[in-house]
Amino acid sequence: MAAGYVGMRISTASNARCTNEAMESGLSSALKVAFAGGSVMGFAVTGFGLLGVGIVYLIFGDPTILMGYSFGASSVALFARVGGGIYTKAADVGADLVGKVEKGIPEDDPRNPAVIADNVGDNVGDVAGMGADLFESYAGAILSSMVLGFSLFGDAGVRFPLVLSSIGILASILAAFLFLRQKQKSPQSALMMTIYISGAIVLIASFILSPLFFGNLKAAICIVVGILVGIAIGFLSEVFTSEKYSQVKRIAEESQTGAATNIIAGLSSGMPVSYTHLTLPTKRIV
């Protein structure tokens, strides 16, 4: 809940600034403002998640008890995601209906009160809801690693995920700082560069920490596979959604003959990438 509150406060503070930067200075400056605001939410989610796990572990000292922490995070994610989604969609539909039936009031006109509710719903659902969802996933991943590590390696298996997650946060902070310092010609390539930088730092740290904690490089190899699969999934998503590649161009050509061919082409392109998104994590585990 604290991460969601911080995210909504930062979102409302950075929205207008991002718009002003886009009008006055262009895309590059607006991207920096948007990235800085989004980074606050990301670091709040990871920071609160890791802090909560560390505090609970220091108090109880038993990794199996930590699963209750994950259940609490899942409950908040459920209410924030579902409740925020229902509110957002209700306000969105209401605003669209007013724009259709009221003469002289176009869609997203600020004179329509439902438009304000729609914007509030976007913050609740897309910021607080998604932040709670990511918080639950992040905490669950750390806790499951700690429980499995404790059952196999004892205290070393508990400390390793905590230390590596802390290094990951520091690597992300460094990558975000480098992003804000450079001039962005292509937003997508600049964002991908932050992923590559933070991933490389985590890889180096894993090869240093794995022998110290376990006496071998097996954990580091698993981390390498996980990072590579994550990057591969992102690249495959880009191939099927970017206008640079043939799939999107083919869907655009099919759309010229009507909505039916657009839907058919979209489904035929989406099914293969769904298969790869399902099988790649499974192959990674195997």
Per-segment meaning from a language model:
Residues 1-278, 283-284:
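Hydrophobic packing and interface segments
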